[in-house]
Structure formats: C-alpha cells, structure tokens
C-alpha cells in the first residue's frame, strides 16, 4: 500500500446554495483541466488529465442519538499516465 500525502484540505459549514455554486465553479475548472485551490496565502495548482476515475458514495453513520449522512465525490487519476486509447482492431 502506498503512502498518502494530503496536499490541501478544507472543511467548513456552508449553506447548500453556496455549496452548489462552488461545485458549478469547480465543474467549469475541471472542464479546463486546471483547478487552483486558494486559502489565504496558500495555493495549490492541480493539473487534471482528461481520463479520470469518478467515485461517488452516499454513507450513513449511526452516532449515539443521531444519524449522520454524507455524500462524497472523489476524482482520481494516475500522475503521468496517458490515455491508451482503448483496444483497436488491426
């Protein structure tokens, strides 16, 4: 198993409309293959290839007297991996 390094992390309470607006902006940046995350003076530029793996999870966790649900959206790729173009017949 490889080693994981967190390059940028953020968690904050937001109004659902603000989250939707952020996701729209993120989608626009993904379409450009380039996302810049900023917080204060911290900045991370992420180059995203055309071929990625999209993982979506909806989870439910029971806590004492509450149930917590979450929606996770994860986009993964291998750095430097190029699209093989799939199988071709010759």
Where are these regions (language model features)?
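Long protein-protein interaction modules used by eukaryotic assembly/scaffold proteins
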Residues: 2-6, 44-55, 59-90
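Short beta-strand/loop motifs in extracellular/secreted proteins, especially
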Residues: 33
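Extracellular/virion structural assembly segments
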Residues: 26-30, 38-44
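Terminal, regulation- and interaction-focused segments at domain boundaries
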Residues: 1-28
């Amino acid at each position: 198993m490889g080693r994981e390094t967190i390059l940028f992390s953020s968690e904050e309470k937001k109004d659902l409309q603000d989250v939707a607006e952020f996701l729209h902006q993120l989608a626009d940046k993904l379409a450009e293959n380039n996302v810049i995350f900023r917080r204060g003076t911290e900045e991370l530029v992420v180059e995203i290839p055309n071929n990625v793996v999209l993982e979506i999870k909806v989870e439910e966790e029971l806590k004492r007297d509450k149930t917590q649900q979450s929606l996770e959206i994860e986009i993964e790729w291998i750095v430097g991996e190029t699209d093989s173009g799939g199988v071709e017949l010759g």
